[in-house]
Amino acid sequence: MSKAPLAVALQYEKGTVPVPRVVAKGRGDTGEAILRLAREHGVPIEENAALAEALAQVELGEDIPEALYRAVAEVLIFILRASGKLK
């Protein structure tokens, strides 16, 4: 596995986007740029190398596969709780 930063951005909007979808992904300089933009815009970042590698296999604009629903749901719940949007 490469040491270059890997970043995968997901879009999910309850009621609008029913399944999280991959909207950006990249390794190295591109991964760093995705992370920088996320930080600049206050987008939560979760570090999970195994999940990022699995999500990186999904084509841009595609919904995540059902096999990753649980792992992604756990990340979304963590983010919502951390932001105070879920108690």
Task: Label every model-predicted segment.
Residues 1-87:
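Divalent-cation
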